[in-house]
Amino acid sequence: DKLIGSCVWGATNYTSDCNAECKRRGYKGGHCGSFWNVNCWCEE
């Protein structure tokens, strides 16, 4: 998966809707994952 930003408000590269942002970039979709779900990952 491709890390594009953060799911935490106020954080660097904050993404309000991870799934929608990933789709906009041409990925299948996305989800918030990693430690405490802080990162937005796009599915290749």
Swiss-Prot record:
An example Gene Ontology biological process: defense response to Gram-positive bacterium
Family statement: Belongs to the invertebrate defensin family. Type 2 subfamily.
Keyword entries, A-Z: Antimicrobial, Defensin, Disulfide bond, Fungicide, Immunity, Innate immunity, Secreted
Gene Ontology, cellular component aspect: extracellular space
Coiled-coil features, chain-numbered ranges: none
Induction of its expression: By bacterial infection.
Subcellular location: Secreted
UniProt-listed Pfam families: Defensin_2
Name of the molecule in the record: Defensin-like peptide
Disulfide bonds: 7-32, 18-40, 22-42
Superkingdom, taxonomy of origin: Eukaryota
Function summary: Has antibacterial activity against the Gram-positive bacterium S.lutea (MIC=1.9 uM). Lacks antibacterial activity against the Gram-positive bacteria L.monocytogenes and M.luteus, and the Gram-negative bacteria E.coli D31, E.coli ATCC 25922, and S.typhimurium.
Tissues expressing the protein: Hemolymph.
InterPro entries found in the cross-reference section: Defensin_invertebrate/fungal, Scorpion_toxin-like_sf
